Amino acid sequence: MNRIAYFLLIAVVLVGCKSSKRLTATKVPEVTASEAAIPSYLASRLQLTIPGKGGSMSVGGTMKMKSRERVQISLLMPILRTELARIEVTPTEVLFVDRMNKRFVRATKNELKEILSKNVEFSQLEKLLTDASKPGGKTELSGKDLGIPKLEKAKVQLYDFSTKELSITPTEVTSRYRQVSLEELMKMLVALL
């Protein structure tokens, strides 16, 4: 009888030690080598210089990027650090908000084909910004480098990079802003040169 009780006790202990959790396999999404080279987040400060007829105009700002989602550029007024303009680029569209004149342009990838170099893609912008953040990378980009030949004289200097996680809230345009055409915006920008 003792032997049976002893075996039952061992059986109960062994059954009680069995894990109730089951192992399941989860699929890890495949990432290409070029995607793996791009950090999930990238931020930097920037200096935009636009040479004009009466000299050049420079303005500072910030750049934030969440890979494969959006790039947000804020151009800030010197000293006061008030936002003058915001440019938000996603894989499908570009939003340019002129905070000073309360106007904006929202253009799709197809609408931008007229002013951008051929085959300009969001992934190319990500690669340019990522390469600039690497030691020895090209940190001064021209309008031509960015795929905007009409603004080839403009220069963007990127510095003070960070790959820490950050929050990028999509830009919402309120009814106080007036939508203008892409052609009107380009005329205004080219007139500065």
Q: Language-model features: where?
A:
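Post-signal peptide N-terminal segment of mature Sec-exported envelope proteins
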Residues: 24-49
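C-terminal motif of bacterial Sec signal peptides marking the signal peptidase cleavage site
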Residues: 13-16
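Flexible, processing/modification-adjacent segments and terminal tails
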Residues: 99-147
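Sec-dependent signal peptide recognition
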Residues: 2-8
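Bacterial signal peptide processing site
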Residues: 18-21
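Non-transmembrane domains of secretory- and envelope-associated proteins
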Residues: 98, 137-193
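Extended beta-sheet lipid-handling architectures
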Residues: 41-46, 56-63, 75, 82, ...
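An acidic-aromatic
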Residues: 72-119
